[in-house]
Swiss-Prot record:
Lineage: Bacteria, Pseudomonadati, Pseudomonadota, Alphaproteobacteria, Hyphomicrobiales
Alphabetized UniProt keyword annotations: Ribonucleoprotein, Ribosomal protein, RNA-binding, rRNA-binding
Family: Belongs to the universal ribosomal protein uS11 family.
Gene: rpsK
Subunit structure: Part of the 30S ribosomal subunit. Interacts with proteins S7 and S18. Binds to IF-3.
GO cellular component, one term: cytosolic small ribosomal subunit
Protein name: Small ribosomal subunit protein uS11
Transmembrane helix recorded as keyword: no
Single biological process term from Gene Ontology: translation
Alphabetical list of Pfam families matching this protein: Ribosomal_S11
GO MF assignments: rRNA binding; structural constituent of ribosome
Organism this protein belongs to: Bradyrhizobium diazoefficiens (strain JCM 10833 / BCRC 13528 / IAM 13628 / NBRC 14792 / USDA 110)
Amino acid sequence: MGKEATRVRRRERKNIASGVAHVNSSFNNTTITITDAQGNTIAWSSAGTMGFKGSRKSTPYAAQVAAEDVSKKAQEHGMRTLEVEVAGPGSGRESALRALQAAGFTVTSIRDVTTIPHNGCRPRKRRRV
């Protein structure tokens, strides 16, 4: 008995006019996820999936390329307006936001949803360069 042929199921094209872009920019990478109003993922991309490795993932250019990729995927689903939620301390925040605006989306609101500890976990040690 051989392997059964696995059928590749194509994602059906949803027609969603507005959504939420979650831009998570850490010190190491930038991930961008576009969801509908309920939080269901429509499209996502990151600097790592765009072929950037190592320290190049954390650059603003890598975040811009990832934002252009995810906007192309989301526009295939008919998305036109976005609310943007930006989180994290990384360098790709502004460039990802500019790339989403340049892709033709109407950005209705921009929110910073970075979590701030009320003296929670102990932070990592200071870098000595």
